[in-house]
Amino acid sequence: MAKPHETILVLDFGGQYNQLIARRVRELHVYCEMHPYTISVDAIREMNPKGIIFTGGPASVYEEKAPAVDPAIYDLGIPILGICYGMQLMVNQLGGKVGRAESREYGKASLTITASEGPFAGMEGDVQCWMSHGDKVEVLPHGFVGSGKTDHAPFAAMADPVRRFYGVQFHPEVRHTPQGMDMMRNFLFGVCGCTGEWTMENFIEEQVAAIRARVGSGKVLCALSGGVDSSVAALLVHRAVGEQLTCVYVDHGFMRLNESERIIKTFRDELGMNLIAVEASERFMAKVAGVSDPETKRKSIGNEFIRVFEEEAAKLGQVDFLVQGTLYPDVVESGTSTAETIKTHHNVGGLPEDMKFELIEPLRTLFKDEVREVGQRLGLPEDIVWRQPFPGPGLAIRVLGEITKESLDILRHADDIVFQEIKKAGLYRQIWQSFVVLPTTVRSVGVMGDGRTYEYPAILRAVTSDDAMTADWARLPYELLEKISNRIVNEVKGVNRVVYDITSKPPGTIEWE
């Protein structure tokens, strides 16, 4: 079905900033979709996009089997912006020449604008940009003019205003290109003729109508975790079909302090939704008893969740649809043609293939910040809208080693202290995730009072991120770190040392397991 809104098509060549391109387009209130570069010309015609963006990628266009689009795309009469590899591909396919650069360009560079065309409309002189490439354009295709240059790249940008084809060798989508959003705005509104009419209000209206039409009189089931993703998905479906939706919340015993009680109260009492709460902590503890391998933990918990969920679903009789809070980054991180699977993801592919439900994934095209906005507009309580991401297996993968009731209690208490202090410092919304990891296979010597102690260290992890695809360790104030450390060591029995993890992603992941 054709999209009801003006659409920008982003073609994915495997670059590290590709999702960021889509995010920037959405920030300008223009709907966009990302598709593999192998998409057919017929599919593009059916989509009828206002413009196409070719992303960056790790390949070189002159290599054998380098990713390339169907050349017929250039005959559609649709504006195209090529970014980094995307620009080089345009050059290569349209008759120009790309070669290896004498010196690579990585990081900040000064771009001299030589033609105020397309993305550079209204700009002149030198602007800062972010480069990440080892190849350069040597000869422009017929019809193009150079529109920007750097010390190492004579054609750092190009323009063919007649066909509305543009290319930039740098990355306008990253914050390190300060005028990058202006360039994106110029392309979307000036070149493609977009009006910026896509909003979260529109999204809600359209999703509610689409869900209502699809479900009809059918019964809908939702596995509710209490996180922002499944909560917003459930609330959106509830807005569409009301009592036809039943939510199942499985308390596996690995939640944070008082979290299960808060989830049940919110959805059953405050939001008036049909909620079945299953207390299954003993079942889950039995499944992970003696298990220390992280992937085995994840799979054991995931499999047991499926069994509990299936049992509850069977009690409801005929159910036609299943709601999942899948987001766009979930799909990418669980593996696509251009992104390797990093670890078993708890949302995507977590339910058995033989379950006789049709999937409803109303948030599948959204990023986390958009989901939060939808939640706010639907009236979801602030503490859930801004709840930090929490892994499906919960605290089970934050206890390194075997899980016991004692280790879970220690971790819960320490984690709650971090939550309290970060919130009190006014930093909770600025931080993507902040939590404690408890390595039960390690003990450290300490001195408390007049005696020596031999207890667990607690690892504090706090990161900043836009979408969890990349993350940086949070520069928490020393005074806050000191307060957290003092409270944990003094108030949590079993911990005598606190350390702070200052690893970014990559090379690390946000979670330890």
From Swiss-Prot:
User: What are the GMPS ATP-PPase domain coordinates in residue numbering?
Assistant: 198-387
Q: Which Pfam families match?
A: GATase, GMP_synt_C, NAD_synthase
**What positions does the entry give for ATP binding?**
225-231
Q: Which UniProt keywords apply?
A: ATP-binding, Glutamine amidotransferase, GMP biosynthesis, Ligase, Nucleotide-binding, Purine biosynthesis
**PROSITE patterns under this entry?**
GATASE_TYPE_1, GMPS_ATP_PPASE
Cross-referenced CDD domains: GATase1_GMP_Synthase, GMP_synthase_C
* Limits of the Glutamine amidotransferase type-1 domain: 7-197
Q: Which GO terms describe its cellular component?
A: cytosol
Q: Which reaction does it catalyse?
A: XMP + L-glutamine + ATP + H2O = GMP + L-glutamate + AMP + diphosphate + 2 H(+)
Q: Which regions form coiled coils? A: none
Subunit and interaction comment: Homodimer.
What is the protein named?
GMP synthase [glutamine-hydrolyzing]
What is the protein's species of origin? Heliobacterium modesticaldum (strain ATCC 51547 / Ice1)
